[in-house]
């Protein structure tokens, strides 16, 4: 299972194993969604919370805007039933993932460290990796939305910092201080 709750539980077990009962928690993008769920589920373990570049999953999906749908198309593509997205991606995994890299972070592949890029390519060519990526996004639509809906009225009682990129898809689409 790839729900943010399950991933958060895995991380809580790891922190316990490492000897940290309470800790500061920082997350970006998917990691921020996991951190948000961890803070809801285990508030007593979190000293402070920093979230970067997200809107809560329920809010994002419930108030979906065209700008976000275009920028985050992969949420809906990867969440389609198996083996649809896996088959399309596997047909040319380099093309798909390099397009993602160019759309999300760089303007040319030469801007990426070539050793890191080769490690990425080796990983994303693995059918099990592609399936896991799809399952992560399936969980957001199958489980995470409903979990967040159950917690809509909850407020966290801990120090928190929420940051986002000015001019990014979230900034353009939502009144982030109000979310």
Predicted feature residues:
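Flexible "cap/lid" subdomain of the alpha/beta-hydrolase fold that forms the substrate-access gate
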Residues: 2-26, 30-179
């Amino acid at each position: 299972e790839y729900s943010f709750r399950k991933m958060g539980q895995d991380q809580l077990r790891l922190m316990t194993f490492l000897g940290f009962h309470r800790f500061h928690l920082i997350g970006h993008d998917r990691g921020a969604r996991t951190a948000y769920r961890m803070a809801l589920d285990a508030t007593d373990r979190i000293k402070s919370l920093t979230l970067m570049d997200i809107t809560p999953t329920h809010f994002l999906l419930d108030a979906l805007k065209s700008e976000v749908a275009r920028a985050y198309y992969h949420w809906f593509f990867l969440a389609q039933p198996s083996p649809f997205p896996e088959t399309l991606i596997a047909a040319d995994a380099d093309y798909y993932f390099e397009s993602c890299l160019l759309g999300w972070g760089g303007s040319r592949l030469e801007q990426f460290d070539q050793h890191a890029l080769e490690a990425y390519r080796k990983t994303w060519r693995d059918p099990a990796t592609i399936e896991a990526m799809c399952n992560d996004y399936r969980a957001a639509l199958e489980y995470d939305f409903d979990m967040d809906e159950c917690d809509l009225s909850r407020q966290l009682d801990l120090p928190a910092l929420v940051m986002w990129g000015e001019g990014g898809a979230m900034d353009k689409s939502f009144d982030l201080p109000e979310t």
